[in-house]
Amino acid sequence: MVYADYHVHSDYSDDSWYLMEDVVKDAIQLGLKEICFTDHVDYGVKPDWKPREEFQVGKNKEVKNVHYDLYFAELDKLAKKYEKEINIKKGLEFGMQVHTIPKFEELYQSQDFDFILLSVHQIEDKEFWTGEFQKGHTHKESYDRYYDEMYQLVTTYKNYSVLAHMDLVRRYLDKEVDRFEYNKDKIKEILKVVIENNKGIEVNTSSSRYEINGLTPSIEILKLYHELGGKIITIGSD
């Protein structure tokens, strides 16, 4: 068995202080044989770094996308430095919305990626974690809008590897009770498209860190994925 983590964030993500080389060293210490860096890009709510703006590793915490030049340069350097101890893959987490698809496709074509996570973090440029997306809507309405957006994404965009933390929005709605039945039919349609396109889904272990009652995605989603013939699953600590 090969122990791997395919959802890893470093200091290049605005919500992490974890230096990239420290991630690698800790992964080796834990016995992992493969990791994939998947730092955040969220077009629509975050700008890119401009050429004259200075990014300082370990210091900058501006709400922006990955500093691509520095990120890919350090990733390549560490992959060579530690190649005898661990396999380091090049990826990103695309926090995608339907209206940002063209920007992400441009980014995808700019690099030779090993792995891309497709995530839904915002809808109509409204964040989940701030509560802006949910404001003025019932839980049912929020779930409906979330899975509708996800369905549009997976039926439109194909240059990704795995659909990340599929029921992420639950983290911001109800950690105790899983509302799988609200959107079972829509989830089924999403999974069918994922499978037909030879993509996968992720088991995201951050559910324990966020004290969610159950797995992410839920055991019901995982069972349905298996029943539909899904075979590709990655594990990520996020």
Annotate each language-model stretch with its function:
Residues 1-98, 107, 172-174, 179-181, ...:
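An N-terminally biased module of ancient metal coordination in phosphate/nucleic-acid-related enzymes
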Residues 40, 166, 230-238:
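Short acidic/histidine-rich active-site segments
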Residues 16-19, 100-103, 214-218:
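Residues at alpha-helix caps and immediate loop-helix transition turns in enzyme cores, especially N-
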Residues 32, 84-86, 197-199, 230-231:
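A short helix->loop->beta-strand "cap" motif at the edges of active sites that frequently abuts
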Residues 103-104, 224:
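A short acidic, amphipathic alpha-helical/loop segment
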Residues 94, 110-228:
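Domain-core and long-helix interface of multi-subunit machines
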